[in-house]
């Protein structure tokens, strides 16, 4: 966990990096050059596997933000205004949400520096992360709360604006669990009795596991991903693995979009490939729902849509799914033409998932 002095130092480093970026633009102007900012091309074709770190990162192809056109000049103008805002925010020890940044731009005196929509401001913050090698959390920027939670035998200390507080993520929380903060690096893990971490996609399945006492019976920390996981959720999952040496397994629906949820936990996402080493847990394993489970348990299903089929075919070429296991499962799913939700396991009874399915799969994987 970061102490107050460590936090001050991190803020100073982040602010210095931002000022260096602004100085680079100024120097280019002073030398009579057209100002530019170079960033990696954020496409699937520019993702490569870093064998040393076991995560997917951006390759060598880059895109250049240049002031040699009106559109390019406006992008750099917006970058300068955003850098100034973030540097001032750090100096004042304040924070803001990504949504607030979008609206705050409407008060800037230069109309051409204002954002057209929040996607534009979000992308600019990501660009600044990449070129400065500082995370948005260090800029004191945060998303809207994701609502993702933890439930399990974990005792931690959290740093808040009101001081420190110590929490047991079973005994000191309600059925909803402990809500993951925007910056999990403010958490210190004090003690735990956990044997592994189970990341669960849907709220319904997470609630079923908690109601059935799965976390207590098997000494598991249940992380609710809440769909596509927020960065904070992926970061705390990585910390649970790295800091506590706990195995991580991911439990999702059986469809192509859920496989991508797993991939973002394990290997990172295209959007945040520059942070894969910080967010991804390459040792994480996929427990299900597998296409093979759909066949074996004769689960209730829905037919694959055209977009599902296209997504599965795309995943056959996705570098994150390039192994025999995923090729076999994806080809099987294309062959049967079906998908299933986690909660389809309830067709065999409300206790089937905790008494049979998960224990058997975890046993096969060597976790239990």
Curated annotation (Swiss-Prot):
Alphabetized UniProt keyword annotations: ATP-binding, DNA-binding, Isomerase, Magnesium, Metal-binding, Nucleotide-binding, Topoisomerase
Gene3D superfamilies in alphabetical order: 3.40.1360.10, Winged helix-like DNA-binding domain superfamily/Winged helix DNA-binding domain
Disulfide bonds: none
GO molecular function, one term: DNA topoisomerase type II (double strand cut, ATP-hydrolyzing) activity
Catalytic activity, EC: 5.6.2.2
Pfam families: TOP6A-Spo11_Toprim, Topo_VI_alpha, TP6A_N
This protein's record includes keyword ATP-binding: yes
Catalytic activity annotation: ATP-dependent breakage, passage and rejoining of double-stranded DNA
InterPro entries xrefs: Spo11/TopoVI_A, Spo11/TopoVI_A_N, Spo11/TopoVI_A_sf, Topo_VI_alpha, TopoVI_A, TOPRIM_Topo6A/Spo11, WH-like_DNA-bd_sf
GO annotation (BP), single: DNA topological change
GO cellular component: chromosome
Cofactor(s) essential for the protein: Mg(2+)
Topo IIA-type catalytic domain mapped to chain residues: 9-148
Residues bound to Mg(2+): 201, 253
Function according to Swiss-Prot or TrEMBL: Relaxes both positive and negative superturns and exhibits a strong decatenase activity.
PANTHER family reported in the protein's UniProt record: MEIOTIC RECOMBINATION PROTEIN SPO11 (PTHR10848:SF0)
The protein, known as: Type 2 DNA topoisomerase 6 subunit A
Originating species: Natronomonas pharaonis (strain ATCC 35678 / DSM 2160 / CIP 103997 / JCM 8858 / NBRC 14720 / NCIMB 2260 / Gabara) (Halobacterium pharaonis)
Gene from which the chain derives: top6A
């Amino acid at each position: 966990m970061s102490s107050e002095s460590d936090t001050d130092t991190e803020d100073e480093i982040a602010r210095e990096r931002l000022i260096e970026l602004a100085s680079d633009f100024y120097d280019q102007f002073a030398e009579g050059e057209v100002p530019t900012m170079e960033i990696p091309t954020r496409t699937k074709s520019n993702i490569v596997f870093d064998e040393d770190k076991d995560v997917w990162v951006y390759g060598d192809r880059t895109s250049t933000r240049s002031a040699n056109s009106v559109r390019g000049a406006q992008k750099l103008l917006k970058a300068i205004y955003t850098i100034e805002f973030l540097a001032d925010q750090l100096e004042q020890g304040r924070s803001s949400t990504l949504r607030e940044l979008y609206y705050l731009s409407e008060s800037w005196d230069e109309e051409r520096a204002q954002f057209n929509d929040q996607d534009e401001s979000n992308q600019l913050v990501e660009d600044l992360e990449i070129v400065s090698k500082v995370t948005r959390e260090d800029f004191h920027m945060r998303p809207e709360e994701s609502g993702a939670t933890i439930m399990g035998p974990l005792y931690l200390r959290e740093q808040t604006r009101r001081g420190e507080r110590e929490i047991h993520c079973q005994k000191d929380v309600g059925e909803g669990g402990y809500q993951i903060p925007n910056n999990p690096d403010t958490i210190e893990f004090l003690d735990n009795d956990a044997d592994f971490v189970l990341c669960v996609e849907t709220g319904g399945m997470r609630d079923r596991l908690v109601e059935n006492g799965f976390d207590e019976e098997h000494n598991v920390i249940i992380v609710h991903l809440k769909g596509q996981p927020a960065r904070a959720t992926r970061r705390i999952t990585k910390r649970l693995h790295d800091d506590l040496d706990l195995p991580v397994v991911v439990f999702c629906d059986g469809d192509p979009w859920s496989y991508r949820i797993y991939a973002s936990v394990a290997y990172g996402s295209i959007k945040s490939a520059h942070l894969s080493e910080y967010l991804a847990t390459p040792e994480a394993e996929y427990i299900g729902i597998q296409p093979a489970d759909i066949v074996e348990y004769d689960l209730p299903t829905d037919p694959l849509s055209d977009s599902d089929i296209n997504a599965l075919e795309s995943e056959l070429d996705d570098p994150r799914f390039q192994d025999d296991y995923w090729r076999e499962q994806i080809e099987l799913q294309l062959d049967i033409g079906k998908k299933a939700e986690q909660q389809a396991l309830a067709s065999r009874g409300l206790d089937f998932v905790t008494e049979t399915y998960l224990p058997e799969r975890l046993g096969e994987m060597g976790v239990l």
